[in-house]
From Swiss-Prot:
Chief location category: nucleus
Protein name as annotated: Branchpoint-bridging protein
Primary gene name: MSL5
Organism annotation: Saccharomyces cerevisiae (strain ATCC 204508 / S288c) (Baker's yeast)
Positions of modified residues (Phosphoserine): S93, S95, S382
Domain KH: 153-219
Keyword Oxidoreductase: no
């Protein structure tokens, strides 16, 4: 009996031990470090003076501020104790390619990347705490950086047809410079697609040829507020480019206009509207413009409606203006612009005859004697020319008829003949005092004979002295 009892107890113990071993068996895919007690956990709670359990009632803003302070303290303890190694995971993401400095040391190890991540997180939390928590004091080992940077990724994969780089840069980079002035931060376009193909790397700033990240805007500033403002201005341009219909993007049209100004190809008339005097529209777009009645306009050349006489394309424009009886397409004769008057009521303003109508059989025009157009009466017989009567003018007092002549010295005048008796006038003038006969000419020069039929002296005395104060012609 005792033996059976011992055996039964032995087998029961064996069975229980096998069950315990079976329960204690660890699967091969389980990370044992996750189930072990963290040795640094006690140190974290020992250095962190903030309690993790809150018994009182807090508002939402107070809870958020308490979380920020607790996380800042937690990160500070990890950095002090060098507990910045992430938990080992079997299925983790692949590590980036190694990067080395000038001394050949690797700068992107696993620990360095995790430490940099914790430091960036603490910097952001400290900036938030300084603004929201009064009398907040940063940790002792905290050093505020001189510049902050962040990335805004552009949705190129969702909208491949939109030229985001061109909209952000603008004509010759003016849009990007304007964004930097508005946000007071430096904005650079980096990532895949930010550099044109064939661009030399020496002409670009450092980091511009890093094509590992997708297309993004790298924003650098000296405060977190400026970083957020820079992200917002970049986001506004991307949203406007995505939501605006084609051809209605005001930003793109403004950039094209500015580019035309820079190239000198902008053609814009800044003159005001001649109708209302405003500059925001053209004359044909003026709201005060009155459209004329085209059907009420009649051409004076062809007689048709719809156009002015100066715009008429009729062949009658090439016809002679003197052909007043010509007609075009059986229309009314072309009317002259001259004003016609009734000769009966206005005899003075009757049309004049043309100089080309000398051979016309029409009777000459007759005007009344009181009209200013009436011909002047013929002069009386007393107004007959002196040349027709062959009478020399009376010399002035003190001059003789022999010395008063219109001839040229040294040249004999042509012979003068008296007109026939039938043509002589019935009246004659008496000779001047001291003269018995009328002298017709002066004596010829010495050595020359007179004209045929006349004597050499011509009835004059060559030796007769000249009047006092006068000298004779040369050679006399």
């Amino acid at each position: 009996m005792s033996f059976r009892r011992i055996n039964s107890r032995y087998f029961e113990n064996r069975k229980g031990s096998s069950m315990e071993e079976k329960k204690a068996k660890v699967p091969p895919n389980v990370n044992l470090s996750l189930w072990r007690k963290n040795t640094v956990e006690s140190d974290v709670h020992r250095f962190n003076s903030l309690p993790s359990k809150i018994s009182g009632a807090l508002t939402r803003e107070q809870i958020y501020s308490y979380q920020v302070m607790f996380r800042i303290q937690e990160i500070t303890i990890k950095l002090r104790t060098n507990d910045f190694v992430p938990p080992s995971r079997k299925n983790r993401s692949p590590s980036p390619p190694p990067v080395y400095d000038a001394q050949g040391k690797r700068t992107n190890t696993r620990e360095q990347r995790y430490r940099k991540k914790l430091e960036d997180e603490r910097i952001k939390l400290v900036e938030i705490a300084l603004k929201t928590i009064p009398y907040f004091v940063p940790p002792d080992d905290y050093k505020r950086p001189t510049k902050f940077q962040d990335k805004y990724y552009i949705p190129v994969d969702q909208y491949p047809d939109v030229n985001f780089v061109g909209l952000l840069l603008g004509p010759r980079g003016r849009t990007l410079r304007k964004l930097q002035e508005d946000s007071n931060c430096k904005i650079a376009i980096r990532g895949r697609g930010s550099v044109k193909e064939g661009k030399n790397a020496s002409d670009l700033p450092p980091g511009a040829m890093n094509f590992e990240d997708p297309l993004h805007c790298l924003i650098i500033a000296d405060s977190e507020d400026k970083i957020q403002k820079g992200i917002k201005v970049c986001q506004n341009i991307v949203i406007k480019a995505v939501t605006s219909p084609e051809g209605q993007n005001d930003l793109k049209r403004g950039q094209l206009r500015e580019l035309a100004e820079l190239n000198g190809t902008l053609r814009e008339d800044n003159r005001p509207c001649p109708i209302c005097g405003l500059k925001d529209h053209k004359r044909y777009d003026c709201p005060n413009r009155k459209i004329p009645n085209i059907q009420g306009i009649v051409c004076k050349i062809c007689g048709q409606t719809g156009h002015f006489s100066r715009d008429c394309n009729s062949s009658s424009q090439r016809m002679s203006r003197f052909d007043r009886n010509a007609t075009v397409n059986n229309s009314a004769p072309i009317q002259s612009n001259d004003v016609h008057y009734n000769s009966n009521t206005h005899p003075i303003q009757a049309p004049k005859r043309s100089r080309y109508d000398n051979n016309s059989t029409e009777p000459p025009l007759k005007f009344p004697a009181s009209s200013r157009y009436a011909p002047s009466p013929s002069p009386p017989a007393s107004h007959i020319s002196r040349q027709a009567q062959n009478v020399t003018p009376t010399p002035p007092p003190g001059l003789t008829s022999s010395s008063f002549s219109s001839g040229v010295p040294g040249i004999a005048p042509p012979p003068l003949q008296s007109p026939p008796e039938s043509e002589q006038p019935k009246f004659s003038l008496p000779p001047p005092p001291g003269m018995t006969t009328v002298q017709s000419s002066i004596a010829p020069p010495p050595g020359l004979s007179g004209p045929p039929g006349f004597s050499n002296n011509m009835g004059n005395d060559i030796n007769k002295p000249t009047p006092p104060g006068l000298q004779g012609p040369p050679g006399l």
